[in-house]
Amino acid sequence: MDNLTDHFLIATPSLEDPFFGGSVIYMCRHDGDGALGLVINKPSPIPMDAVFSAIDKPVPEQFRSSLVMMGGPVQIDRGFVVHSPCGEWQSSIAINADTALTTSRDIIERLAENDVVGKAILTIGCASWDAGQLERELEENSWLAVPADGNILFDLPFHERYRAALAKLGIEPVMLMREAGHA
């Protein structure tokens, strides 16, 4: 199995899990020990305003009227930030040359200053897999994988990310429908 770090996982209709159905996951780590990713197309009820007001900082323009994404059902008490450029942070891992995952508070403070981080997605919680678990789910056709695209990740509204990720594979959502109609 290829390393799926810096890929999107796209849920197929065979994945009937109520949380992950219809999800696009940005894979932040995939190795022999397991995998970690963030759902990037399902909003939480938490407004970005609340994140910045919690640290007494103004909300940057790019985050006004935005919601924190529901990154996954694991560690839902923890925040995760996927951002570009990478930069130097207290708790961060590089995903590729331009994108990193950071879990330390210092990035939120710098996001408020609007001077270091160009683009970012904030999530609560994450998705994680034990060693071999993701590979089994891929064999069961629960997920489609495609190299990630920064435009889809950072620039598209969350509700357009599923369709756009599928389009990278030349697939329209209707092509994945479980049951065809009868004429």
Task: Walk through the language-model features, giving the residues of each.
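A short aromatic-anchored loop/beta-hairpin motif
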Residues: 1-123, 127-183
